[in-house]
Amino acid sequence: MAAKDVKFGNDARVKMLRGVNVLADAVKVTLGPKGRNVVLDKSFGSPAITKDGVSVAREIELEDKFENMGAQMVKEVASKANDAAGDGTTTATVLAQAIVNEGLKAVAAGMNPMDLKRGIDKAVSAAVEELKALSVPCSDSKAIAQVGTISANADDTVGQLIAEAMEKVGKEGVITVEEGTGLQDELDVVEGMQFDRGYLSPYFINKPETGAVELESPFILLADKKISNIREMLPVLEAVAKAGKPLLIIAEDVEGEALATLVVNNMRGIVKVAAVKAPGFGDRRKAMLQDIATLTAGTVISEEIGMELEKATLEDLGQAKRVVINKDTTIIIDGVGEESAIQGRVAQIRQQIEEATSDYDREKLQERVAKLAGGVAVIKVGAATEVEMKEKKARVEDALHATRAAVEEGVVAGGGVALVRVAAKLVDLKGINEEQNVGIKVALRAMESPLRQIVANAGEEPSVVTNNVKAGEGNYGYNAATEQYGDMIEMGILDPTKVTRSALQYASSVAGLMITTECMVTDLPKEEKADLGAAGMGGMGGMGGMM
């Protein structure tokens, strides 16, 4: 086991505080509409330019191990805020720095750290309740666009794109962000259910100009098995041909004689047909087939429940208004399934989301909800260079997380105003002793720090602006972009309540632990041994005689 270096008391706290300040100072320059960029050197490729707090925090490692521990703990604040709400990482870092700095001053003055922490926790709990009371629901497109714009660093085209995407696919819909190929941002919306499986044979294509298969008002056969024998399918094919409608087959696989016969029948015009593999694998495939069955009012033909393909009738087939299939994807538009059945299925999947233990499972289940409930929107980010593309894509993703958080828990006045108002309401909050009261004051003073930092980054005097904002009431605040005072909500400067709440809770949690630290332990740096290689080689000179 390696030898350890141990520091106690003030020595430990001073080192830790230095690390906290190095990381927080690097992150906080990005806060607000006039925040600056940070350039991150990469071991390969060109440097990355970002205004995203958590991206900056993740890059910072300090040489001094005690200072690095302080930096890593603040990095944890940014990461947790990012995981919880997808945004607010810089705010969380600024809050943590303010609480740690003020708290450690109180500890140095002889206060009991445990009571200080209890005071901080008490103030934060009360602040969270006040934030919830201040929160306003965010449901209309205008508010969603404003939240997206603020989170994307005052880029209103991003805000509009996200609002448009949410309007098209609903609040539950899947919205993904991809790198585009042009200079302009684009929004592609896929209405209906899309899954990543294309046609099994190019001979099914009936739209050569687009290389796609389009079926109008088709029947949909869902089979949880491989189909290789055409005899199994003859009764269904004959019934569909009589009905004069096209047929889409979704099965584990269609191969051999069955696929060849379908292709021949399709090319001769006897029955218009296309076949695709079912999406997913194993249990997930069974579940997704059931989703499609619910959407199209069909039945999954499965031997597990005693159904045979030969006995399938038109009543077992699903139906949709239209199906579009290309090389890689299938889209089912306007399935005829009943709304009540679809909502029941969605509720069932939501229950599974709550019980899911892994992020991967949760993500896949949420995708299934979106495909059933709304649709899929893809925002394609346009930029002139790869460096700009990466920076912009990160901003759009942040803005998307922020708007989702806003829809979930509502919005409060932005620009750090909500926390200033909350702190003003808690001035009379008291603990059970003087040290807890100091802890409460530490937390309330820290709540002004985001506003102060936004103002400082805009090149103004933080104390003057903070006092002016405190003199006002309600949503009255300072717009750093235009350097004007006014109603923040009317000016469209909104923060999601969830983002502000998460930033405050995670900052106080980690900062409270740091204030109560009395001892720090780390590995001693290993001494590099002298390079003995050259000296050892000298003895090999005598080998000359062996030649």
UniProtKB/Swiss-Prot annotation:
It is an enzyme of class 5 (isomerase). The keyword Chaperone applies. One of its GO terms (molecular function) is isomerase activity. GO terms for cellular component: cytoplasm. It holds the Pfam family Cpn60_TCP1. The keyword Nucleotide-binding applies. This is Chaperonin GroEL. It comes from Edwardsiella ictaluri (strain 93-146). The gene is groEL.
